Amino acid sequence: MKKQNNGLIKNPFLWLLFIFFLVTGFQYFYSGNNSGGSQQINYTELVQEITDGNVKELTYQPNGSVIEVSGVYKNPKTSKEETGIQFFTPSVTKVEKFTSTILPADTTVSELQKLATDHKAEVTVKHESSSGIWINLLVSIVPFGILFFFLFSMMGNMGGGNGRNPMSFGRSKAKAANKEDIKVRFSDVAGAEEEKQELVEVVEFLKDPKRFTKLGARIPAGVLLEGPPGTGKTLLAKAVAGEAGVPFFSISGSDFVEMFVGVGASRVRSLFEDAKKAAPAIIFIDEIDAVGRQRGVGLGGGNDEREQTLNQLLIEMDGFEGNEGIIVIAATNRSDVLDPALLRPGRFDRKVLVGRPDVKGREAILKVHAKNKPLAEDVDLKLVAQQTPGFVGADLENVLNEAALVAARRNKSIIDASDIDEAEDRVIAGPSKKDKTVSQKERELVAYHEAGHTIVGLVLSNARVVHKVTIVPRGRAGGYMIALPKEDQMLLSKEDMKEQLAGLMGGRVAEEIIFNVQTTGASNDFEQATQMARAMVTEYGMSEKLGPVQYEGNHAMLGAQSPQKSISEQTAYEIDEEVRSLLNEARNKAAEIIQSNRETHKLIAEALLKYETLDSTQIKALYETGKMPEAVEEESHALSYDEVKSKMNDEK
């Protein structure tokens, strides 16, 4: 109940409504007290009433250049004028008093006094008083003062918590953490051993700067952490602060930019001022590309708010006196869009690429995230790491979290191998849709489609191994085949990429050979194949006709002018022809493989229709012997990790 009242009080509309009634009521009651039973008349009416002898008393008071006149009628008058708020019909009232204002051009005080005396009216003269002036002034100013007071109070509440007032828009929004509050250490960051080695110097400088400065060394003013999302860039920055034992100021790049001009630059100055007071300290700017994009290409023109903020950031990082002991660590996914002035030596002069972890790194990451999870004995994290190539730390954490959720839904007390297997499928392809009604014809189409991918992958197995195939719908896919690399690869050869292209074409080719139809199930296959083939031609120089030339590099930024065409129409045509040639070659290769292995292709498709999901051991048995393993034929069940381990050993 208390929270509801606070919400009502802080509602701006209710405040404005309250202030309106307050001011209106104040003015109404003030005017009502001063004018009850009285009417305002002009100078002509005043002279007429005095001449008619209907004025009993007359009081006038000089008020600057005008004369304020009031009086009492001998014979009260009746009036139907509204003197206040009327809710129904106006009432008839008796008017005994009157007021009037006489200008210097109307008459003089002596003439008015003589006229009133001649007609037997009692005249009273009041000297000009300053109190009346002050009362009128207060009546005019007090309501507006109250209005502005409440408006500023509301702006203070809406200006953000933490005691901010409406004048504090320019204060830094960074979250400050004292060294005692930072519990993250290098041991908590797994799978980034090389990256940690690059940051050791930063930690050592913050701990003992004299050891470097006496040799004339200059520690990097800024460290740029670049890498895909989820690789642990923020965690690395916290670990540096934790190991060095220094305060940590964290802020997002988007927090600098506001609709008010100059706010971003002011926040940058405020951030560095706070860091200087706490030096030595670390400033961490997450997603710095939000504020550090190249100047002159923004949507707001050449002198927009973002550019002013960037200019101030450049100035603060440029080695001004007093910045010693402050190291700026920034994280981004797109260093290619950052302003060159931000990346020059003296600012972000050290760049650390935080890449995807290898199999050992993935295993170490899994061990870190499995500390608070009860795992069964059949769970082998090394095997999970082998099955998740390309996964980053966030993906691996998500796998274990999904496994815990799956185990909870199944009312288990520990997480076993089947839970992790299901979690991997959910992360890769989405939740299964077992209740989705699929016609028998469509099931056959999907089975032969996935069997086409599988048979091509089995034949072309130089770099990748078929790990799993299923026709259980997940996400938007009717089925899928997973092929894992035999080992972590940083480089792909032209032949490896051609094999992948042929594997992607296997599904559509199988549809055409078996059913003589073309379905929409191959749309994602074509998308991946086209992207890969175009990259081979335009980025990797793998076209014999076009040669080792890169035609497409960094993509244009949002807000930048359209990039000038660096290739001719003829070259663009030749690029399209080369891409088409690669895809047709892959298609023909897939067709040749499926035609040569029609019986095996049919066996895999029929097994998929019966069991829905096949693992690597079952697929290998069908390919080599034409039969399913006997243990699996007896009963369909979720594979244990012991079975998966034996399959992985067989694949090797």
Swiss-Prot record:
List of residues binding ATP: G227, P228, P229, G230, T231, G232, K233, T234
Primary residence: membrane
Cytoplasmic side: 1-11, 153-652
EC number: 3.4.24.-
Cited InterPro entries: AAA+_ATPase (IPR003593), AAA_lid_3 (IPR041569), ATPase_AAA_core (IPR003959), ATPase_AAA_CS (IPR003960), FtsH (IPR005936), P-loop_NTPase (IPR027417), Pept_M41_FtsH_extracell (IPR011546), Peptidase_M41 (IPR000642)
Keywords: ATP-binding, Cell membrane, Hydrolase, Membrane, Metal-binding, Metalloprotease, Nucleotide-binding, Protease, Transmembrane, Transmembrane helix, Zinc
GO terms of biological process kind: protein catabolic process; proteolysis
Binding site for Zn(2+): H449, H453, D525
Membrane topology value: Multi-pass membrane protein
Record-level GO cellular component terms: plasma membrane
Residues that span the membrane, as ranges: 12-32, 132-152
Protein name, UniProt field: ATP-dependent zinc metalloprotease FtsH
Annotated source species: Streptococcus pneumoniae serotype 4 (strain ATCC BAA-334 / TIGR4)
